[in-house]
Amino acid sequence: MQVFWFIPTHGDSRYLGTAEGARQVDHTYLQQVAVAADTLGYEGVLIPTGRSCEDPWVVAASLIPVTKRLRFLVAVRPGLMAPTLAARMAATYDRLSNGRLLVNLVTGGDPAELAGDGLFLDHAQRYEASEEFIRIWRETLAASHEGAALDYTGKHLSVKGAKVLYPPVQRPHPPVYFGGSSEAAHELAAEQVDSYLTWGEPPAAVAEKIADVRARAAKHGRTVRFGIRLHVIVRETEDEAWAAADKLISKLDDDTVARAQEAFRKMDSAGQQRMAALHANGVKRTRADLEISPNLWAGVGLVRGGAGTALVGDPQTVAARMKEYADLGIDTFVLSGYPHLEEAYRFAELVFPLLPRSVRDKLPGNVLNGPFGEVIATGIVPRVAAS
């Protein structure tokens, strides 16, 4: 099991859908979140992309010198740059970070945003172009280790003599992650990517996705790993966790939810449509309605695009729910919480000790419990209380 955190380049807050409690997200703050994730033992961080975010590659590059072991899951967007340019950027980043790059292929699902970026392909065409893009990207980087060039002719993209002179550290290329819920997305994942990511849906729905992608990959003679993108709201007790979930959306008003849902309806992303269906396009507003599966809460998706669900509960329950997903085949958990700095600490302190040994064995020594807390009086070293 791998556990990643999230760099909030689109903003951070204590509440959703309001400026109240908003936090200044500048470079100093992004560094704080990255250093916390690195220090606490998260294996990587996702850096999002889109017009609502700071540029992921610039942000990721700026975080190399302040981290030691943290890996960076950075987006590439087919259509915004040539695949060979993306390959050179990836190779350079991988070399400068000593092999810490992971690449997230993002096709895009908002026609308005895509049009603003000069992309006027429909859903099917975007996936065709994305398949050609990542094929050129992968094969160019693989060839770079031998000093070879690539010729490729496709429907949307073609290259002749494509070459990367300075190969990446990782062979044949940095691992490729990708998420999508349509049939076209599943086929692309099966044929081209290393890890398929799903947003946090109920376990039965996730199991169906895994089975479909796995079967498609087998037809291509490939195996694919699986990951899930979730928010987390964990507290020492269940009641405290659910109170925190209620507080997160306590400043929302009907107009804000309606405007968000209207924006989501204009998207042609199958994944976004599935997220919206979990809360009935904003109609569901009570805890009973929003808890769509035990401890899986759809409240975040009332106003947040993309990943819209959170695991809510005490440490033991959240760890148990993660195990349920792991038993389905999920091996990478990409997590986040509001605000991202404090919640990185809270999740690590409360849940990491309960996760499988494969996670605990990779944690930096004594980072979560010691060697001791604040000294009592002037010289008494505190001890761990008996359970």
Curated annotation (Swiss-Prot):
Source species of the chain: Ralstonia pickettii (strain 12J)
Similarity remark: Belongs to the SsuD family.
Record-given protein name: Alkanesulfonate monooxygenase
EC numbers for this chain: 1.14.14.5
Cross-referenced SUPFAM superfamilies: Bacterial luciferase-like
Catalyzed reactions: an alkanesulfonate + FMNH2 + O2 = an aldehyde + FMN + sulfite + H2O + 2 H(+)
Source organism, top-level taxon: Bacteria
InterPro entries listed in its UniProt record: Alkanesulphonate_mOase_FMN-dep (IPR019911), Luciferase-like_dom (IPR011251), Luciferase-like_sf (IPR036661), SsuD_RutA_monooxygenase (IPR050172)
Alphabetized UniProt keyword annotations: Flavoprotein, FMN, Monooxygenase, Oxidoreductase
Keyword Transferase applies: no
Keyword Oxidoreductase found: yes
Entry GO MF terms: alkanesulfonate monooxygenase activity
GO BP field: alkanesulfonate catabolic process
Function: Catalyzes the desulfonation of aliphatic sulfonates.
